[in-house]
Amino acid sequence: MKEGDAKPDLEASLPAAQGDCAIRCRDVCRSYGKLKVLSNLNLTVPQGQIYGLLGPSGCGKTTLLKCIVGTLKISKGHITVLGKPPAFPGHEIPGKMVGYMPQDLALYNEFTISDTLIFFSRIHGLTWKETQARMNFLIEFLDLPQKQSIVRNLSGGQRRRVSLGAALLQNPELLILDEPTVGVDPVLRSKIWQHLVEIVKTGKVSIIITTHYIEEARQANVVGLMRNGNLLAESPPDTVMKLHSSTTLEHAFLQLCESSDQNGLKQGTSPQGGPLENSQSFDSSRDEGLPILSREAVEVPKCTADWKMRAKHMLPKPRIIAALFIKTMLRMKRMPGSLCFQFLLPVIQISLICLCVGGDPRGIQVAVVNNETSPSSYSKALLAILDNSSIMQVPLSHDKAFEGVYKGDYWGVLGFGENFTSYLNKRMVQKTVSRAVVDGGSVHVWLDQTNQQIALMLQKKLHEAFQTFAASKLGSMSYIADLPIKIEEPIYGSQNKDFSTFVTPGAVLSITFYLAVGLTALSFVLERKEGLLDRCWVAGVSSVETMLAHLFSQLVVISVQICLMLIFILLVFKMPNEGSLMLVISLIVMQGVTGISFGLVISAAMDDEQSANQAALGVFYPNLILSGIIWPVECIPYPLRYLSLALPQTYASEALRCIMYRGWGLSQMLVWRGFAITLGWNSFFLILATVILKLRT
């Protein structure tokens, strides 16, 4: 069964020195800090041949492959792949010209087989007709189950075959397969090798395959043995065995390793057992196997690209962004429980804030010591007026009342003297009275001040009750009991609003921001851990395209969350909105996008879920406390207030309050400043995340 191979799409013909090889590595070094993974490595992959790359775990095979496909930069040396350096502007490596199958499979478990292949076909720009033809061929060739089968439900061998199918999908000119036949049925393994041999016969497809089945590598045209970041041997399998008088390839490689250890050679040994120079020149023996390319030193071709090509290479491709966007939305669709939870969580949170924050305390027990016994006394009239829904009066003796407060049973004590009524009348009528009369005509209050909100509420209720009591007793002369300070009607807002009115706008922004952080903080971490990011990089996806796709997909989620929150706070809890609803929505959406951007920074910078979660939670409380969401910024001491004003939500919270409660628009500085600060932080986080992601790839 055959499939047409994709034609090379190079902008210029291969240089003369490079036209006979697919990959040429010269003096390649790669280090991670002080650890040298690749040390002056030289490797040549002939055009149109299968190259078996063998070596123990940790010898540098995966690092070398990442350098070849352009997702990892080399510290020193030169690499050319299909005539040009990897990641060269206009060169589709990484991109459509390379098919990559990583060892860890790197598949989306929520996808079906068809979803997986369609996703990569969108990345590579295949037409729908081409995609269907290739999909049908690969499903039949790789003996895969029905294309609607979920990857999560497949066996390990079936998943490996799906991963191989994704690598073969676009008929690449270069195939890099990392352990493609592990866990695969022997019959199917033979069939896969037969297909690989068949597609290289045209001379247009070159294959690098790594395997720990050493004898299986005998089917390759050329084998190379890596150890400690060096290439010990590179020749046809039969040549290697003959030169070491071995009947098996495994035994020949064992001899090479022993020889390398004995000689202490760090740059490897040739198949003949001698030390290798940097050129690592080997003799080719056509009668012993397929010809090997000359390892004589060649001049590295200088590739140049004009500014138009570089600009085109840097600009994000809408096709790839759309593919990544559809991928993310499809994964969300396949997890309906998680999606519903994401939609309901902000509604639950804002409902709890509106219901539980800012209201008056209820059922506060207060001990009452009333030494007046007359039913018509002023003390009984005043106590009758006191708000009984908030304050529960418990009549007690003086000693019992204070004992109860000391035990924590009551929040305070109200005390009335036995002559409270007569002394209060004297205070109102007589011009001069003694201190004893003033004291006896006063309500004595002892409060537990450990809870400031309850203590302030008790004082407020007592003052309101006394004002009502005085008005009832003085009639038209009630103004005598008024304070000389008169609070007029508010310019903005109303006098009967509670603390929840202050908290709610900031809470909406905070919930939107941190739910967006939570949505994205683990996205790159999990995809990097599962190898999905690396596979996308090799397919030609850039960091900018990845960022934009995540941004757009998460924007859909937070848009639904914002709509549900606004419905609840405006229609259910009747929060006032005197300004433009579009400005309210715009500011909340911008805060959500800023949260997404910050989550992407965390996800790009962190390597594991625990670190990402700690980073997200670590900034939650400082930002909540310092941003003026639960307490005014004016209460923050000045050295710390400068930090508060620099945070993303401080000015934004103030701007949202101005829009909702004052009805202000963008002409007011307090409003447009909130938008400007939010936009600035959003741009900063996006650029930072893109830079971090690019540096880490």
Task: List each model region and its residues.
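Conserved ABC transporter NBD signature motif
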Residues: 77-95
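Catalytic Walker B motif of ABC-type/P-loop ATPase nucleotide-binding domains
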Residues: 175-178
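Conserved ABC ATPase "signature" region
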Residues: 118, 122, 130-146
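Helix-to-loop junction immediately C-terminal to a conserved catalytic motif
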Residues: 69
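Membrane-spanning alpha-helical segments of multipass transporters and channels
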Residues: 243, 341, 348-359, 370-375, ...
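Extracytoplasmic/periplasmic domains immediately adjacent to an N-terminal transmembrane anchor
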Residues: 187, 206, 278-501, 666, ...
